[in-house]
């Protein structure tokens, strides 16, 4: 037999993120200047607040944060993958057995990971002079975890976050900001959305196939193929109640003040069977005549279930 082993490792990172302003003083001054350029008579951030913020940054990172949200929410991901295979045989039978494992830690700092187990088996045998049989079976089991609002929404929240938005107090309270910004009266905290809930998915797939070939008299060939596919897909969403706090007053604001859980399950089985009789003959050197008849049978059984609870 021949044995093959392989291992692969990789580091992942965001290939590109926007070059945003992370200095809160620069951000507030630039926003004010943009509003004046538009012809507005008043600006968002008054001078006293900007001066207070600039001085406060020297003493209190919670009330006067300078949040770089790309640095806070992204990390280097890590990927590892292992595979093993054994193969061999004789002139009448051959076999191949393989298995693999993959583990991936995503580039977001929480609820961003995946895991996969895979395996396969193939056997081909010349049972008699006329009969040939092949069997194959393969499957995989996958797990992955995503942020509760989904990857695209979470990335959008990170992109929109401002450097004046707070992160988290040592006691676990998620912060917002004491400054008022038009259109951001209930500001998102990207770290809160990454940590306070997730979607966990499990996907299991099995594929099996049996091939039979038999040479009948008079040059007639019989072929049969039986296939089986089973899929199980399970998903669970869970979201905590989300609150943010004014870092100055500790006034609580309801961002998403409910707890919810949702389970979703889907099961499907697919059967296929087809068989053929074929005959062919060559004549005249460059002429071929072929005839084939066959039948096919397919069956699909599926069911799904979903339940949701919200408090």
Q: PLM ranges: what are they?
A:
Residues 91-96, 246:
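Short coil-to-beta-strand
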Residues 213, 217, 280-282:
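Short, surface-exposed loop/turn segments at beta-strand-coil junctions that are enriched for proline
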Residues 1-6, 79-81, 94, 100:
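A beta-strand signature from Gram-negative outer-membrane beta-barrel systems
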Residues 4-65, 107-207, 223-225, 229-311:
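Surface-exposed loop/interface segments of Gram-negative outer-membrane beta-barrel transport/assembly proteins
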Residues 1, 66-77:
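Periplasmic N-terminal accessory/gating domains of Gram-negative outer-membrane beta-barrel systems
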Residues 102-104:
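Ligand-site clamp/hinge motif
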Residues 74-76, 86-90:
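Outer-membrane beta-barrel initiation region
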């Amino acid at each position: 037999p021949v044995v093959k082993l392989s291992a692969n490792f990789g580091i992942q990172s965001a290939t590109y993120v926007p070059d945003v302003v992370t200095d809160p003083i620069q951000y507030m001054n630039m926003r004010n200047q943009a509003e004046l350029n538009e012809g507005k008579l008043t600006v968002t951030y008054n001078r006293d607040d900007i001066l207070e913020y600039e001085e406060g940054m020297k003493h209190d990172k919670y009330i006067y944060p300078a949040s770089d949200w790309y640095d806070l929410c992204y990390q280097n991901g890590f990927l590892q993958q292992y595979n093993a295979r054994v193969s061999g045989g004789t002139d009448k039978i051959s076999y191949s057995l393989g298995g693999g494992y993959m583990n991936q830690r995503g580039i977001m700092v929480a609820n961003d990971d995946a895991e996969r187990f895979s395996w396969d088996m193939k056997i081909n045998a010349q049972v008699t002079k006329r009969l040939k049989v092949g069997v194959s079976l393969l499957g995989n089991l996958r797990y992955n975890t995503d942020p509760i609002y989904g990857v695209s929404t979470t990335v959008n929240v990170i992109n929109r976050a401002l450097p004046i938005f707070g992160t988290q107090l040592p006691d676990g309270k998620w912060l917002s900001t004491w400054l008022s910004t038009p259109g951001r009266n209930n500001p998102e905290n990207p770290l809160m959305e990454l940590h306070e809930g997730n979607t966990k998915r499990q996907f299991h797939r099995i594929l099996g196939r049996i091939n039979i070939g038999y040479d009948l008299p008079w040059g007639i060939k019989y072929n049969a193929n039986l296939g089986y596919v089973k899929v199980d897909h399970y998903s669970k969403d869970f979201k905590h109640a989300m609150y943010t706090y004014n870092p100055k007053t500790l006034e609580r604001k309801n961002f998403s003040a409910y707890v919810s859980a949702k389970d979703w399950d889907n099961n499907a089985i697919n059967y296929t069977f087809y068989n053929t009789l074929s005959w062919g003959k060559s004549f005249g050197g460059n002429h071929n005549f072929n005839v084939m008849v066959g039948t096919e049978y397919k069956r699909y059984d599926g069911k799904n279930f979903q339940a949701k609870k919200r408090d």
